[in-house]
């Protein structure tokens, strides 16, 4: 069998260099062997590593084949009858014997291929330039032009085309030729008569190839299915093409093949990912040391910053273990811009770090220059009180000219944080008109029996601080019903654990401003309780929201309202009461 397949060199011209056997493989120069893609240096073949991870691992072996020259056999063109072009006839073929032989070295052959490719590219660019000129003269074929019809390739010079800046790949030179070009090549090769019957045969072949697959729809009957009768499988590239059967309805005895686009897409994505991974690995190797140095420098620069933050938090707050308490921290947006001052830094810290409680209840003192704006704002709040009760706490006592709403933060901690000295926060108390309600023992089940002492602090015009004590008796809360007892039971106010509640009030000349809910998260679960403003309210219609904003007690305003005489009597009783809290000036 090997004798039959062996090529008979006797039929080839004896002058052909390929018919002679080389005396030695060492005659090939290193430069020529380096130009060949199939030659491998034996010294480096043992350490060969595949250039791409997509390639399969090959057996590392030495190759003793070296190429020293390239022999080219030239054949004349003939009508082929062997190929099926996309249109027309006049197929291209070659004669049975070559008419010439030429030998090249590896370098010479590469240069010859480059020259041929440049010639083909030049002809292609000249044809494109000619077609563009004809379209321009005829205005895209709408106008007839005699000058356009007389133009030929000879009229296009090399200066009109840009050959050097045109980049094409190897596949460009394997483009199919049109019918006219094929017929011209055959006549130039000496073919005098072109068989026209080939044209009809090729048309019939193309038509038969266009009609592929069976004509079945959904179901395939083996007796009528053309694929089954031909003994081939039904093929489905997309829905109903070329075969119209489904996977469940196909009864072809030969089987069925279905194109899976998801599988092809998955394979494509995996291949792209592998190539990207390989590319990233190659790029990361030279820059690995630089990245390590940048990371170390970045970590060293970030280290002291994190330490300073922890240090500032630790020094800004003093935490003492006391029974559980709830503290409300209030902070205005304007105080964020004044962190340079020590007093405002403490206020900012208590608002930012909600997990750490501060026993110094922060207050905002009113400014004399802002009294007119405060009065106008409080009047608007009283008008919208029925519609917007409990929506948000609006602080009317700002330290700046602009009045902004204040957020409220409810903080729970393991103990109540208290300062060692009240003199540290004396600046807050000196300029404040805040009411402080100290509940020493809140026992669930007895909310109607309130006998604690309360104190109200007002600032005298000359700068001294006076305390006006008063005692709140159970008669002052006539509508504190049983429903309120169950709402504020042991689940929210543990027994024997004191709590601090901060409520902001206005000045003596201002109307009562509704305070925000201290416990907004329990607003929907607790009943609404409202107390009448018996000290600050100028009229019987003014209300101060207590604890949770709106109240259902508003349906009985007659019971909550107090006359002017009762207010004066109550004020006298408050003066006679002993002072509970003393704040140093």
UniProtKB/Swiss-Prot annotation:
<protein>
    <recommendedName>
        <fullName>Cysteine/serine-rich nuclear protein 3</fullName>
    </recommendedName>
</protein>
<feature type="compositionally biased region" description="Acidic residues">
    <location>
        <begin position="335"/>
        <end position="349"/>
    </location>
</feature>
<feature type="compositionally biased region" description="Polar residues">
    <location>
        <begin position="351"/>
        <end position="366"/>
    </location>
</feature>
<dbReference type="GO" id="GO:0003700">
    <property type="term" value="F:DNA-binding transcription factor activity"/>
</dbReference>
<dbReference type="GO" id="GO:0005634">
    <property type="term" value="C:nucleus"/>
</dbReference>
<dbReference type="GO" id="GO:0006915">
    <property type="term" value="P:apoptotic process"/>
</dbReference>
<feature type="compositionally biased region" description="Polar residues">
    <location>
        <begin position="41"/>
        <end position="52"/>
    </location>
</feature>
<dbReference type="GO" id="GO:0043065">
    <property type="term" value="P:positive regulation of apoptotic process"/>
</dbReference>
<keyword id="KW-0053">Apoptosis</keyword>
<dbReference type="InterPro" id="IPR031972">
    <property type="entry name" value="CSRNP_N"/>
</dbReference>
<comment type="similarity">
    <text>Belongs to the AXUD1 family.</text>
</comment>
<dbReference type="GO" id="GO:0000981">
    <property type="term" value="F:DNA-binding transcription factor activity, RNA polymerase II-specific"/>
</dbReference>
<keyword id="KW-0238">DNA-binding</keyword>
<dbReference type="GO" id="GO:0000785">
    <property type="term" value="C:chromatin"/>
</dbReference>
<dbReference type="GO" id="GO:0043565">
    <property type="term" value="F:sequence-specific DNA binding"/>
</dbReference>
<keyword id="KW-0805">Transcription regulation</keyword>
<dbReference type="Pfam" id="PF16019">
    <property type="entry name" value="CSRNP_N"/>
</dbReference>
<comment type="function">
    <text>Binds to the consensus sequence 5'-AGAGTG-3' and has transcriptional activator activity. Plays a role in apoptosis.</text>
</comment>
<feature type="compositionally biased region" description="Low complexity">
    <location>
        <begin position="30"/>
        <end position="40"/>
    </location>
</feature>
<keyword id="KW-0539">Nucleus</keyword>
<dbReference type="InterPro" id="IPR023260">
    <property type="entry name" value="Cys/Ser-rich_nuc_prot"/>
</dbReference>
<dbReference type="GO" id="GO:0006357">
    <property type="term" value="P:regulation of transcription by RNA polymerase II"/>
</dbReference>
<dbReference type="GO" id="GO:0001228">
    <property type="term" value="F:DNA-binding transcription activator activity, RNA polymerase II-specific"/>
</dbReference>
<keyword id="KW-0804">Transcription</keyword>
<feature type="compositionally biased region" description="Acidic residues">
    <location>
        <begin position="368"/>
        <end position="389"/>
    </location>
</feature>
<dbReference type="GO" id="GO:0045944">
    <property type="term" value="P:positive regulation of transcription by RNA polymerase II"/>
</dbReference>
<feature type="region of interest" description="Disordered">
    <location>
        <begin position="1"/>
        <end position="52"/>
    </location>
</feature>
<keyword id="KW-0010">Activator</keyword>
<feature type="region of interest" description="Disordered">
    <location>
        <begin position="335"/>
        <end position="395"/>
    </location>
</feature>
